[in-house]
Every structure is written in structure tokens, then in C-alpha cells.
Amino acid sequence: IPLRLVGSEMCISDSSNPHPHGQIWAQKSIPQEVKKKQFNLKKYYAENNESLLSAYLKKELKVKERIICQNESFVALVPFWATWPFEAMIISKTHYKSILELSENEIIDFASILKTLTIKYDNLFQTPFPYSSGIHQAPTNNNLNSEWHMHMSFYPPLLRSSSVKKFMVGYEMFGEPQRDITPEHAAEKLRNCSEIHFSSVM
């Protein structure tokens, strides 16, 4: 059974529910997007004996320009394939298939980087920053699923200010998504945001 943990912050993201809320989805079948991801993860792992996200994270840590912040256990970055202007991922530095494998210290580090990233989001436009987020991890089907590397993705809709939202329309609906700013520029803007929430210094 694939389990997905998803959450939304503020109603502008994707719902009419005006408060932050979370959901846990469990299904008998794997959704198409996740199935495609699993196929590619499995193929890479079989060929390289390493998780795709482990290899990807090594490259990002060398380049550094898309890194937002990091701590001992996790890295927050803007992936080079990001669709949303300030899309981000939190990836564990150690290859864990599931959030259930984290140690007590790693859980604290996960909470810490989650707090840092969401404060930076709020500070970007000095507003409670809307986003949808979700954790992808190995299915609970009793298989090894060694190819999976748990990660959390954030899809925020804001573009240039607290009132300008990105819409997927026209060519983006019928062709492919277009980026309004580069992942490198988005990461730089978020990296330069304070880790102290704007509301506490006003």
C-alpha cells in the first residue's frame, strides 16, 4: 500500500479550507506519477547500486547554487527540474527509504530544517506563505524497495509578491510548464531570507 503524507498551508494553494491542514492517503494502487518515479528510481538503483537521490544530492552539494539551507542530516534545495517558482525539496543526507527509519536526532534535524525552510518562505514576501507539501517514501508492500529515498516536496504558488500567484494555463497546460525564474535565482532569494520570522522583528 503506498502511503502519502500531504499538507497545505493557507487556502490560496489548492483548497477552500482556510487553515493549514494535513492528510494521509493510503491506496491499493500506486498513482501514475509515483509509479513513473518508482520505475526510474528502481532502474537507477539496479544499474548503480545507489539511490538516485543520493547521487543527485552529492552533485547539488558540490555545485551549491541551488541549496537553500542544510543541517547535519538534511538538505533543503530548489531542484533543477522545479516547475513552481519557489518549489523546494528536503532530502535526507543518509539514504533512508522511510521517515520511520530516522533516529531521534534525525527527527529533530528534520523538524529543524522544516521550520527553517517555512520561515524563509514566510519571510520572502513577509506573508504566511501558501504551499502544498508531501512526503514520498517507500511503499509498505513488504518488498525491499531499496531504490526509494524519502524526501519532502513543497509546491508554493506565489510568484512575485504575496498577491501574484502562478497559474498553469495556455502552453503550460497543453505543452509543458515554463519557469518564471531560474531554480538558482529562487534558491538564492530563499537562502538570503532570514531564519528569524518577520513577525517577531516587527
Predicted region positions:
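Single conserved hydrophobic/aromatic residue that forms the stacking wall/gate
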Residues: 1-7, 12
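Contiguous mid-protein beta-loop-alpha structural module that forms a pocket-lining wall or clamp
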Residues: 8-9, 17-26, 33-35
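C-terminal helix-cap and adjacent tail motif
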Residues: 28-68, 156-202
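Long, well-ordered alpha-helical scaffolding segments within enzyme catalytic domains
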Residues: 50, 102-128
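Short beta-strand/loop segment at the start of cytosolic alpha/beta domains
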Residues: 65-79
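Catalytic strand-loop segment that frames the active site of acyl-thioester-processing enzymes
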Residues: 76-98
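Short histidine-centered catalytic/ligand-binding loop motif
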Residues: 90-111, 175
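C-terminal hydrophobic structural anchor segments
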Residues: 123-166
